[in-house]
Design a protein with these regions (language model features):
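Exposed acidic/polar residues on beta-strands and adjacent loops within beta-sheet cores, strongest
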Residues: 1-149
Length: 149
């Protein structure tokens, strides 16, 4: 199963593409692949992991339906804005309140909130996630926050 849609990831006007696929076969062997490509086809961000770790019950007869729902949800909601980031808090307070950890400096975090830009968020396991932005100067994606329970 594979889906793609146009998104802006590098900046608010970039013409990029978000591609999400789950390989065929039983859940315990299927691979989840998330890729964001530029309009020229360059990989801006990629994530590859066993799909099994992203679902609660992988030993269910309706796994195909669950996989479709997973892909549909991520393809429609995966790219958001750094404007949605909560205000900066000290690490312990942030983790307590948001079940997450800020992975960039306070200065960078507050700049991302003050000047919103596209941000890709996706699960990293059943109850975990990460959010990344593209740093055009560095030419790579940067993890802003990670979280999970």
């Amino acid at each position: 199963m594979q889906k793609a849609r146009d998104v802006s990831f590098r900046n608010a006007t970039a013409e990029d593409v978000l591609e999400i696929s789950i390989g065929t076969g039983p859940c315990e062997r299927a691979t989840l692949t998330i890729v964001v490509r530029s309009d020229l086809g360059h990989i801006l961000y990629s994530y590859v992991a066993p799909f099994k770790q992203h679902v609660a019950d992988w030993d269910v007869p309706e796994l195909d339906k669950e996989a479709r729902q997973f892909v549909d949800g991520l393809i429609s909601q995966g790219v958001e804005s750094t404007a949605s980031l909560p205000p900066w808090e000290e690490p312990d307070a942030y983790e307590e309140k948001h079940a997450g950890r800020i992975e960039v400096s306070r200065e960078v975090y507050e700049k991302l909130r003050a000047k919103p830009r596209p941000m890709m968020s996706h699960p990293t396991y059943h109850e975990g996630w990460k959010s990344v932005v593209y740093d055009e100067r560095a030419g790579e994606a940067v993890v802003v926050v990670t979280g999970g329970v």
